Amino acid sequence: MERTLVCLILIFLGTVAHKSSPQRPDHLLIRLRHLMDIVEQLKIYENDLDPELLTAPQDVKGQCEHEAFACFQKAKLKPSNTGNNKTFINDLLAQLRRRLPAKRTGNKQRHMAKCPSCDLYEKKTPKEFLERLKWLLQKMIHQHLS
């Protein structure tokens, strides 16, 4: 009887300790929020960006967010030659082009979806490019949390 009671107490304490342990940080969510901050900083310097038109995905379907984000990363967003903040902007752009952490689930579904090529999206000004990128990041955060 005592052994059974001791075993039950140990099992109970083990489950309580397991549930109270901190969860691993969600690297994808942290990275997406960091990207939102980068976009906000780039919007401050949008007058210092090269006015070249850029491919900016819009109305991205549910399984194509990562591919659309890759289109944003491939765009030739760069500082203008006349800007005073060229080094700072280049640092922000380098952070923007870093790869996203892998998702834990749903990778198989994402690869089965037919996503449009980057060339099929409209070209927009840097201001609208940043607005659409911000919208996509918000959508990715919302979908990741749900």
Curated annotation (Swiss-Prot):
Coiled coil: none annotated. InterPro entries: 4_helix_cytokine-like_core (IPR009079), IL-15/IL-21_fam (IPR003443). Disulfide bonds join C64-C115, C71-C118. GO terms for biological process: cell maturation; cellular response to virus; germinal center B cell differentiation; natural killer cell differentiation; natural killer cell mediated cytotoxicity; positive regulation of B cell proliferation; positive regulation of cell population proliferation; positive regulation of cytokine production. Residues 1-17 form the signal peptide. Keywords: Cytokine, Disulfide bond, Glycoprotein, Secreted, Signal. GO terms for molecular function: cytokine activity; cytokine receptor binding; interleukin-2 receptor binding. Its main location: secreted. Glycans are attached at N85. GO terms for cellular component: extracellular space. It is found in: Secreted. Belongs to the IL-15/IL-21 family. PANTHER family: INTERLEUKIN-15-RELATED, INTERLEUKIN-21. Cytokine with immunoregulatory activity. May promote the transition between innate and adaptive immunity. Induces the production of IgG(1) and IgG(3) in B-cells. Implicated in the generation and maintenance of T follicular helper (Tfh) cells and the formation of germinal-centers. Together with IL6, control the early generation of Tfh cells and are critical for an effective antibody response to acute viral infection. May play a role in proliferation and maturation of natural killer (NK) cells in synergy with IL15. This is Interleukin-21. It comes from Rattus norvegicus (Rat).
